[in-house]
């Protein structure tokens, strides 16, 4: 099992960053702690806590829980989860988490509407895309949307420390070069999963001392560019405006 899954937070307070979502008096935190959780859409870059938050919410409820990945799951799996909401075992309701929901087509999204409307199913879905571009209006109108922001290096360091303690406890104590954790956190593009993967690889690729140069060789700094996402169109817009403004350096 990857280190990122082993040291995954088990409470909302352990989630890295996202204070706007999980601080004590935030709207989302209050919804989670209430008994009236609506269907939710989590959107944001990879490795920012969307799946972790869904898992924590699932453990807090007494609902029947299904987890589906839209990139690999079939229509039959979705149908089975929806059908289960009609059984006695789903007396307290059904919670379904759909990861990468942007890969569900309109027909699949529409199949969920009936169950969302009558309350048999509470849905948590996540996407790395802008939900207002990839999800259908009728589906979005029945959900509350929350954005997960890229993590800062400072917010990622505690997760790296937690991962390092686990590795040392499980496989043996090792030393680290000063500034190693900060170096890893600065080159992972706000993705805590990537940071923990780099840490894990660095640990096993090193002798008794983990060094920054080894971590750097095992990490490639993310530029955050996505040919299909918002960043692609933001970049094109910036290029167009630079050309329009006769700024060759800017272009």
Short names for language-model regions:
Residues 142, 158-171, 201-202:
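Conserved AAA+ ATPase "sensor/coupling" helix adjacent to the nucleotide-binding pocket
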Residues 32, 102-141:
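Conserved catalytic/switch belt of AAA+ P-loop NTPases
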Residues 63, 136-151:
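A short helix-turn-beta junction within AAA+ P-loop NTPase domains corresponding to the substrate/partner-engaging
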Residues 69-71, 144-157:
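Conserved AAA+ ATPase "SRH/arginine-finger" region at the nucleotide-binding site
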Residues 21-26, 63-95, 106:
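Short glycine-rich substrate-engagement loop in P-loop NTPases that contacts/grips substrate
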Residues 213-250:
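C-terminal engagement/docking regions of AAA+ P-loop ATPases
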Residues 182-187, 193-207, 213-217, 237-241:
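C-terminal helical "lid" of AAA+/P-loop NTPase domains
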